[in-house]
């Protein structure tokens, strides 16, 4: 019985994609409008959620941003803020921002500098789609890699955060 519990527990832990305490989020990032943002200011009294876009033309990624936008009020209950990471030129990212109207910073991943640290680069032209929650010190709190037309990670992040039960 202990063996089965141990195996089950190992499976559950490995499937949540939890990561050790290496600091992976940069101290400073620049959004596509040229604004320098410090991680400490983003994370002040908030949990930073990084959303990576597989590509600028990924329809599944765009739909997910639209759904997250619809749930902003719910996510604000548990002090969540977002940053979107994309590998594309600034002009294309700005066109995307206009299209999805997602009211959080978009970051251009120049030369895969950020995604490489997170093991999310899928060179030569894409990122691995992911949702990552960061602790206030820049270490990873939770992550889920991958999305498809059958699985968006929305439910996983909602279940993990359980914002409806925050006071």
PLM region descriptions:
Residues 62-101, 112-116:
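Structural microenvironment flanking redox-active thiols in thiol-disulfide oxidoreductases
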Residues 6-15:
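Bacterial N-terminal signal peptides
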Residues 16-41, 63:
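N-terminal "domain-start" segment that seeds a small globular fold
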Residues 40-68:
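Short active-site neighborhood of thiol/selenol oxidoreductases, capturing the structured segment around
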């Amino acid at each position: 019985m202990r063996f089965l519990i141990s195996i089950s527990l190992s499976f559950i832990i490995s499937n949540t994609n939890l990561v050790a305490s290496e600091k992976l989020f940069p101290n400073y990032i620049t959004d596509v409008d040229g604004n320098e943002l410090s991680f400490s200011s983003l994370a002040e009294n908030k949990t930073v959620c990084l959303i990576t876009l597989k590509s600028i033309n990924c329809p599944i990624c765009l739909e997910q941003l639209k759904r997250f936008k619809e749930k902003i009020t719910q996510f604000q209950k548990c002090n969540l803020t977002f940053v979107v990471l994309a590998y594309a030129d600034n002009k294309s990212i700005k066109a995307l921002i206009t299209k999805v109207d997602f009211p959080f910073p978009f970051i251009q991943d120049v030369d895969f500098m950020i995604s490489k640290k997170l093991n999310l680069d899928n060179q030569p032209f894409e990122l691995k789609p992911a949702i990552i929650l960061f602790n206030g010190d820049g270490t990873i709190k939770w992550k889920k890699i991958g999305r498809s037309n059958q699985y968006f990670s929305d439910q996983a992040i909602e279940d993990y955060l359980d914002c409806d039960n925050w006071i």
